[in-house]
Amino acid sequence: AVGELKLNPGRADYPDEGYRSRFSHATEKAAPGYYEVMLDDYGIKAQLTATQRVGIHKYTFPKGKDGHLVLDLVHGIYNYDGKVLWANLRVENDTLLTGYRITNGWARTNYTYFAISLSQPIREYGYKDKEKVRYNGFWRRFNMEKNFPEITGRKIVAYFNFDTVKESELVVKVALSAVSTEGAIKNLHAEASRKSFEELAEAARTDWNNELDHFEAEGTADQKAMLYTSLYHTMINPSVYMDVDGSYRGLDHNIHQAKGFTNYTIFSLWDTYRAEHPFLNLVKPERSVDMVESMIKHEQQSVHRMLPVWSLMGNENWCM
């Protein structure tokens, strides 16, 4: 954001009260591995791409304006009171943030660790803890709301200010891990370190082209769009659920090592057994072998000794 700093998301019917922004579909550009849009309220161009474990953001701020970045550890795709069990954020230095967020919900105990690298140094930062009931012991002896390097809680929203007057572009690389912040840092270094946004976006484009080039089809433009969109969807889930060193969080919430296979999660088996998995057996047999091995590990880690019903982020949802 630019201008007045807001730490509430705002309502859909009144976006001016929060940090959300209006946008027009006319400024959107979307392709496998890439998304771009103009945030009209702030005049910020947002571009997104990804590697397997790292999301890369590029924000171009208006010339002559300081930039703000809001890190909301409360809100997600769907929200309700009590969803966030605990969250932590550390400012390791002026270009590296680490932390984690533990949530319940469909995945009853979902651990998400992160490491965030910034292309420009932080000028100043602060937090808001929106929890109504808080521990007010030793930690509250510090002024933790501004330039304090660590914050924990259930309803944490942080802000970071940057001097973007001279350099208007800010690249943010967000690496994820279900294991640890150390694992997230390893993922960041292995997949996105020392590479520009443009290089990473081009690599994502190449990877998706390699995936989608397995088929040649004849037909109308609409028919081809339907085919390749469906093919694209089959390559999203099940998804890889392990760090670059093979570490992953198992169904028993212990840390395991995937030896000789790639560990997967998100098995919506009630509807994928009919079409997607037979399809993957034909076009990606090596991937199917890894998925079967992942299901076997799920069974071995299950206190019920059951294969997955509906596996999500290393949790059994007992759904469908």
Describe each PLM feature range:
Residues 1-264, 297:
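Beta-sandwich/jelly-roll carbohydrate-recognition scaffolds of carbohydrate-active enzymes
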Residues 265-320:
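Aromatic-rich carbohydrate-recognition surfaces in CAZymes
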